[in-house]
Amino acid sequence: MKTLKNKKALMLAVITTLTTGFTAEIQAAKGVLQIKETVKSDYAKTKYPIVMTHGWLGWSRIGNDSFNIDYWYQILPDMARNGSTVFAAQLSPANTTQFRGEQLITQVEEVLAITGKNKVNLIGHSHGGPTVQYVAAVKPGYIASVTGVGGTYRGSKVADDIQSNQASRTVFNIVGQ
């Protein structure tokens, strides 16, 4: 009985989150976001640009200049201040790996055009891990390296539970498009 209540509470939290702020982010990716800062050192400099890829229900930054939530906890500006050419991918947070991967390919091509480089380093968090692996498999010539941070390479119990529920599948199919 307690497990059923926990599942219902989780579903309510997910639906509430989606309907109170993430809906616009879920509907479409806005394109790659370059992080620019004044260079303080070059300890984080890499040969190729870095593209950071968020996980399921993720974002790059939400809010405005006076109040915002940064998915990457200010790591990207620190990397930029210290020599990295770094971009934050902005993908549909509630969609398939293939769908997100195709969005990421477009953004990687944008990064290549902006920087004039022929490859990128991809870093993916959570669902971003399988997403960057998809890109590496489909467009290996674009990729210098692939790194997963807490990647969901063997699936996710939470995702399995949500997908096994018809009501949640219906909600995510509607919102995820």
Model regions: which residues?
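Serine-dependent carboxylesterase/thioesterase catalytic core
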Residues: 54, 102-177
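Hydrophobic helical h-region of N-terminal Sec-dependent signal peptides
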Residues: 12-16
